[in-house]
């Protein structure tokens, strides 16, 4: 691999000269473009830390600290660009050097916190600060914690994962084109939940739970996550006293000792129609 000096209004950067970069430069010179080339050009600009192909300005220290606020991390050193190391500080006052890119995009956190045991009170405070509830004991930063998010979803995330920005997998879904309220069932219970991809979710639950005969009974397409969450909560409240009591896998609290047909009848009272029917 060779290197090539790219000039951008009086600034020159020595970067790896790959076929992708060669293609980006050539297309820029002759005025041609395509979605693929635009993405490559954007990555090239981000690599150099001077903005992107859409003309957006590079991030400021204030921008980065706002993005990192819920992780308890902030920049305290000089900021040059995303690929140049600077000094970060965590909420326990540890300082270390890292590139902004590794903190923002690779989700790396404080190396001192990940290697040291912290008190249960401090763990509880970190979790409550993001609106979550701790439902299990704390062993170490790399052992998954049983958590409940502020939307009532049960999930399993390590303390390291929380520090790196991981959150409830249900709440992190993007619902621009709508999503699904689904009903899954097997010989020992029925599960009601929400997902963008119910078939994929079925495989995940089967793998984590070991319920090999679990199957997708039916689903309902909904326009936004808020509507789906409200209906999911209605079902969970209705059958609260019939919860199966499963644990130790994501979605374990969403199983009920109820026939799936009964849940369909309950949802019909909200005027819902089964997807594809």
From Swiss-Prot:
<keyword id="KW-0540">Nuclease</keyword>
<keyword id="KW-0238">DNA-binding</keyword>
<dbReference type="GO" id="GO:0003677">
    <property type="term" value="F:DNA binding"/>
</dbReference>
<keyword id="KW-0378">Hydrolase</keyword>
<keyword id="KW-0426">Late protein</keyword>
<protein>
    <recommendedName>
        <fullName>Putative endonuclease</fullName>
        <ecNumber>3.1.-.-</ecNumber>
    </recommendedName>
</protein>
<dbReference type="GO" id="GO:0004519">
    <property type="term" value="F:endonuclease activity"/>
</dbReference>
<keyword id="KW-0255">Endonuclease</keyword>
<dbReference type="Pfam" id="PF13455">
    <property type="entry name" value="MUG113"/>
</dbReference>
<comment type="function">
    <text>Putative endonuclease.</text>
</comment>
């Amino acid at each position: 691999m060779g290197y090539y000096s790219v000039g951008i209004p009086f600034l020159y950067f020595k970067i790896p000269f790959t076929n992708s970069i060669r293609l980006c430069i050539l297309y820029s010179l002759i005025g041609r473009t395509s979605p693929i080339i635009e993405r490559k050009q954007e990555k090239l600009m981000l690599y150099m830390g001077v903005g992107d192909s859409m003309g957006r300005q590079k991030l400021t220290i204030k921008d980065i600290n706002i993005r990192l606020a819920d992780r308890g991390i902030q920049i305290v050193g000089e900021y040059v660009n995303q690929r140049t190391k600077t000094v970060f500080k965590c909420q326990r006052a540890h300082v270390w050097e890292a590139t902004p890119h590794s903190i923002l995009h690779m989700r790396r956190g404080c190396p001192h916190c990940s290697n040291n045991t912290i008190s249960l009170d401090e763990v509880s405070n970190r979790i409550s600060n993001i609106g979550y509830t701790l439902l299990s004991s704390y062993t170490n930063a790399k052992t998954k914690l049983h958590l409940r998010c502020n939307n009532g979803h049960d999930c399993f995330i390590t303390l390291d994962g929380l520090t790196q920005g991981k959150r409830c997998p249900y709440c992190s879904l993007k619902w621009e084109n709508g999503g699904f309220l689904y009903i899954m069932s097997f010989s020992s219970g029925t599960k009601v939940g929400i997902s963008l991809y119910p078939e994929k979710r079925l495989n995940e639950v089967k793998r984590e739970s070991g319920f090999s005969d679990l199957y997708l009974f039916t689903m309902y397409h909904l326009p936004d996550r808020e509507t789906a969450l409200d209906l999911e909560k209605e079902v969970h409240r209705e059958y609260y006293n019939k919860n199966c009591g499963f644990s130790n896998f994501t979605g374990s609290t969403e199983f009920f000792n109820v026939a799936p047909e009964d849940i369909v009848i309950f949802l019909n009272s909200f005027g819902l129609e089964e997807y594809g029917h």
